Amino acid sequence: MTDLIRVDAHAHLYRTPEEGYAEKTGYEVWEYGDQADVHQTECVGTVDELLLQMRSAGVSKAIIVNLFSAAVSRKVAVEALPEGLTEYEKEKRTADIDAWIRSEIVSFNKWNCDLSQQHRELVAFVAADVNALPGPLCAEHITDMVENYAATGVKLHGAYQDFDMSDERLWPTYQACEELNVPIIAHSGPDRKSRGFAEPRAFAKMLDSFPQLRVVIAHLGGGSWIQTLDIANAYPNTFFDCCEIVAWTQSENGPTEQELAQLIRDIGSSRVMMGSDFPWYDLDYSIDRVFSLPILSMEEKERIIGANAVDILGL
């Protein structure tokens, strides 16, 4: 029966339309280069929008991955400080900003968990950010979210959050996830400063150190997809979603449909899940894109659409 299930393994939600609109318009998908015809949706990431799309597309579960960046939040808040502050005033305001950021990530994650209790078709993956919760605080927060708020997994985005995926500040968080047996879904792809923080090869040291950790490398490596197969072959505890990248098969830096399908086949289609990256893309569009891929059998595509996520994420 699980073969017939449809699961969106990568979606985002926001507490208000304004919050979703700001996040969506402020986050540019640039890494694939130019493409003449890019799919767009008018949605801004509200709960009602997603539930409507799930019903329309026949999706029974959606993984809600919280996207939060202390680095971005801090930069925006510091830039908004009034001019003419004394050094003491600036330090005080900055300390207040950091305290607000810590409370904000906790609040956002609790909201996601509460949402999953109200709507059982939504599955909460909470944000981890060592720039918001330094030292052991991040691991302690994740443990609290899993044990007391029913979080099912963790979301990371090194390029956006401004840390390398193998930054050892993350080690306590990875250890907590490994001990709790909860998976991580992590953005992968290049960053604008070419630091390689979230490229597939940036995961190697982390994967060496935590061989029992289930890690989903999102977007099949995105604009760095050429690196993905080597990581998949080296680390059997890695899994993947094809969200976003499946919309960019006519771009300068993305794979062609043939190359994308071959990559999925070479990795092993049972290790790959469908995700929409809602509200950047629609659910039915993302499903149709998977079904349009060459090479793969109908059975493989149907499992990518749903059953693989059940197995990989333990739904």
Label every PLM stretch briefly.
Residues 2-9, 18-61, 262, 268-273, ...:
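Mid-to-C-terminal alpha-helical segments outside catalytic/metal-binding sites
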Residues 10, 54, 112, 154, ...:
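Conserved, mostly hydrophobic/aromatic
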